[in-house]
């Protein structure tokens, strides 16, 4: 983890390291401390710092921290050193963190041949991160001459020479693998941005050629014709048997950075390289986008003592998640005891300015990625808009070109090669593979062994993986396609869909009828990758339809809720209006007094009716109120009602009681029920009515 303070959030640090693998950890830690572990702020700052470290402009000399003194820009470390007999052992350990090794070159291999003048090389490139190499050696591990030494801020190499006497003693051990990039391939969303080469096969027994990888430029002349850079005897890399793998890896942010390939000198090898086992190296070759209209020009020089100097910007060399890459894997040949591989004799270096005079050995595995094959002018004009990959190289021999197992990536499908232009964009979509095995024929006592090209598509995003194996049959292995992998030709698009980039098709460069291959045959060549991708797209399409149905249901619910809300708002508005109208209709004070008097009168009537009902219930069922015309007239009758005469004693007692009543006072009659009460009572004995009401 980071050697930062205790204030660093390690979860945020892990997320930032995953998102920006090219930025050193100390820079991420410092950014987190400055922004108080704010993820958004750190992402905004690191997105700007990421560009600097991608293109080698970041400051990697952390002299203040001894714990990270070995930390260097992992973009500048290339895995080419396979043996322990290396010049630079500290660089190998310093760059082991990214799974690669330092780009070195053995002293015993000899220096590169300086066949070109210093003033006629590539154009000036921006400064890059300094490569940490020993003093006196350049980035390729070769001793620099005292006349033209590299400056520290530039990542370049110096092409020195030892003289003509050393040239005659050196042995050309070459089996070049050439990667040609067209400068007018437009960049797009699916354009590959780096080239991943796992390794090159070790030298074949009794073969005077070694193995190397060149990048050739395409020079666009003012007349509009495209030609390949002329091959000369300069920039020849030598290999000893113990370090057979060497890759030149230049790249520019402007035009397509290329390194001129050259034929070996006219010498035969009396040495036999030691047989090497299966060795794998990982080299990421960045592919820069053509932003400038002037590609680098390369000229020849007759002097073998002339030195050359070039600066290279090695960028985007990462072992993290790789996207937008072209991955090429070269496997060593499986030796057969019954077959004896021989070289086809010495070859002379081409000093003319024509590509037609160049002839390469037939058993050299060559990989081309270009807008037009490096063949004759007729062949170039016929297949100019094609981006093709060839497993064998015979750039000057059209007859041998037919017998090569080649793979073409065509930028425009369905049209004739003569009518195509160079404006087609390279889209790393699903490639349809069309492989033609070579026609085996013997030339004298030599038997040509052609490597096989296996094109696969791994699970990295927008990756085109090419495996070159000399003795294996061609096959296409299925790869896991990322869910964000964009396809343009497997499913039917809607009518309003506009295709922005063309699909690459792998066809044969030498056969004219390949352009008229039916779409069914192309789809059959897609193998499991296309089938898996199509199944994935069908699954995604079904999922999209299901989500659309759910969206429609949710939209209907939303409309229903909106209608209910509108109705409730209307009801509320009506109630408010009604309330305001009722407030305006308040009665006046006179009307309220009249209503109060009416209510009082009604209450009196109710009380009278209630009392009549009570009186009816007290008189019994024989009481007939209708027979009494004036009921209230009899209320004021004074005098007792004489009882019925029963016997004598009742007659005698009656006057006595009356006397006593006279003594106490007269009885008072109730005004409500006409009951005669005792004079001492203040309320009626029957109805509880007050005496003086």
Curated annotation (Swiss-Prot):
Modified residues ((Microbial infection) S-methylcysteine): 673
One cellular-component annotation, GO: nucleoplasm
CDD domains named among the record's database cross-references: CUE_TAB2_TAB3
Effect caused by changing residue 684 to S: Disrupted zinc-finger; abolished methylation at C-673
Effect of residue 562 to R: Loss of TRIM60-mediated SUMOylation
Sites of the Glycyl lysine isopeptide (Lys-Gly) (interchain with G-Cter in ubiquitin) crosslink: 611
Domain of life of the organism encoding this protein: Eukaryota
Start-end of Polar residues biased regions: 97-130, 232-282
Zinc finger (RanBP2-type): 663-693
Record keywords: Chromosomal rearrangement, Coiled coil, Cytoplasm, Disease variant, Endosome, Isopeptide bond, Lysosome, Membrane, Metal-binding, Methylation, Phosphoprotein, Ubl conjugation, Zinc, Zinc-finger
Residue ranges the record marks as coiled coil: 532-619
Residues modified to Phosphoserine: 372, 450, 482, 524, 582
Per UniProt, location of the Glycyl lysine isopeptide (Lys-Gly) (interchain with G-Cter in SUMO) cross-link in this chain: 329, 562
InterPro entries, per the entry: CUE (IPR003892), TAB2/3_CUE (IPR041911), Znf_RanBP2 (IPR001876), Znf_RanBP2_sf (IPR036443)
Subunit structure and binding partners: Interacts with MAP3K7 and TRAF6. Identified in the TRIKA2 complex composed of MAP3K7, TAB1 and TAB2. Binds 'Lys-63'-linked polyubiquitin chains. Interacts with NCOR1 and HDAC3 to form a ternary complex. Interacts (via C-terminal) with NUMBL (via PTB domain). Interacts (via the C-terminus) with DYNC2I2 (via WD domains). Interacts with RBCK1. Interacts with TRIM5. Interacts with TRIM38 (via B30.2/SPRY domain), leading to its translocation to lysosomes and degradation. Interacts with ASB1; this interaction promotes TAB2 stability.
Protein name: TGF-beta-activated kinase 1 and MAP3K7-binding protein 2
């Amino acid at each position: 983890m980071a050697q930062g303070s205790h204030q660093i959030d390690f979860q945020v640090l892990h997320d930032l390291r995953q998102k920006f693998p090219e930025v050193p950890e100390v820079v991420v830690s410092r950014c987190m401390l400055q922004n108080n572990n704010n993820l958004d702020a750190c992402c905004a700052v690191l997105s700007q710092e990421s560009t600097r470290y991608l293109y080698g402009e970041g400051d990697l000399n952390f002299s203040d921290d001894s714990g990270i003194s070995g930390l260097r820009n992992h973009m500048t470390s290339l895995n080419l050193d396979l043996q322990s007999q290396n010049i630079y052992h500290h660089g190998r350990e310093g760059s082991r963190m990214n799974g690669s090794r330092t780009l070195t070159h053995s002293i015993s291999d000899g220096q590169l041949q300086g066949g070109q003048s210093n003033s006629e090389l590539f154009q000036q490139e921006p400064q890059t991160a300094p490569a940490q190499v020993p003093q006196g050696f350049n980035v390729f591990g070769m001793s620099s001459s005292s006349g033209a030494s590299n400056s520290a801020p530039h990542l370049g190499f110096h092409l020195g020479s030892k003289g003509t006497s050393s040239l005659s003693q050196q042995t050309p051990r070459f089996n070049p693998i050439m990667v040609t990039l067209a400068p007018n391939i437009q960049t797009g969303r699916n354009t590959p941005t780096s080239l991943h080469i796992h390794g090159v096969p070790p030298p074949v027994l009794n073969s005077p050629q070694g193995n190397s990888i060149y990048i050739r430029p395409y020079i666009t002349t003012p007349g509009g014709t495209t030609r390949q850079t002329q091959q000369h005897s300069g920039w020849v890399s030598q290999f000893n048997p113990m370090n057979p793998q060497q890759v030149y890896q230049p790249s520019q942010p402007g035009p397509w950075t290329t390194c001129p390939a050259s034929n070996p000198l006219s010498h035969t090898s009396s040495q036999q390289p030691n047989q090497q086992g299966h060795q794998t190296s990982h080299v990421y070759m960045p592919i820069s986008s053509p932003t400038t209209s002037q590609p680098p020009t390369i000229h020849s020089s007759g002097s073998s003592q002339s030195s050359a100097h070039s600066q290279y910007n090695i960028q985007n060399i990462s072992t993290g998640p790789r996207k937008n890459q072209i991955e090429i894997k070269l496997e060593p040949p499986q030796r057969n005891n019954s077959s004896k591989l021989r070289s086809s004799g010495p070859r002379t270096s081409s000093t003319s300015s024509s590509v037609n005079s160049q002839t390469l050995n037939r058993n050299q595995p060559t990989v081309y990625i270009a807008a037009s094959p490096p063949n004759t002018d007729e062949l170039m004009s016929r297949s100019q808009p094609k981006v093709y990959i060839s497993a064998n190289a015979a750039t000057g021999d059209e007859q041998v070109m037919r017998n090569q197992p080649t793979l073409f990536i065509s930028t425009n499908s369905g049209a004739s090669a003569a009518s195509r232009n160079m404006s087609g964009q390279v889209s790393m979509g699903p490639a349809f593979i069309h492989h033609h095995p070579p026609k085996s024929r013997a030339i004298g006592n030599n038997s040509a062994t052609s490597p096989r090209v296996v094109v696969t598509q791994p699970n990295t995003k927008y990756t085109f993986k090419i495996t070159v194996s000399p003795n294996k049959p061609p096959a296409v292995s299925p790869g896991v396609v990322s869910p964000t992998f964009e396809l343009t030709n497997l499913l039917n698009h809607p009518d309003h869909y506009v295709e922005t980039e063309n699909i690459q098709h792998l066809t044969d460069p030498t056969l004219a009828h390949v352009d008229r291959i039916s779409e069914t045959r192309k789809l059959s060549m897609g193998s499991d990758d296309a089938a898996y991708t199509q199944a994935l797209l069908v699954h995604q399409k079904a999922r999209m339809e299901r989500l659309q149905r759910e969206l429609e249901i949710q939209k209907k619910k939303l409309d229903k809720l909106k209608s209910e809300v509108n109705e409730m708002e209307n009801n509320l508005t009506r109630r408010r209006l009604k309330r305001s109208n009722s407030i305006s209709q308040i009665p006046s004070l006179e009307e309220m007094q009249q209503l109060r008097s009416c209510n009082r009168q009604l209450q009196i009537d109710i009380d009278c009716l209630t009392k009549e009902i009570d009186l009816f219930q007290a008189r019994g069922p024989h009481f007939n109120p209708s027979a009494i015309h004036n009921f209230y007239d009899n209320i004021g009758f004074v005098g007792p009602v004489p009882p019925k005469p029963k016997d004598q004693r009742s007659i005698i007692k009656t006057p006595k009681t009356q006397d006593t009543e006279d003594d106490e006072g007269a009885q008072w009659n109730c005004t409500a029920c006409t009951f005669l009460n005792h004079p001492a009572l203040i309320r009626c004995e029957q109805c509880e009515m007050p005496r003086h009401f």
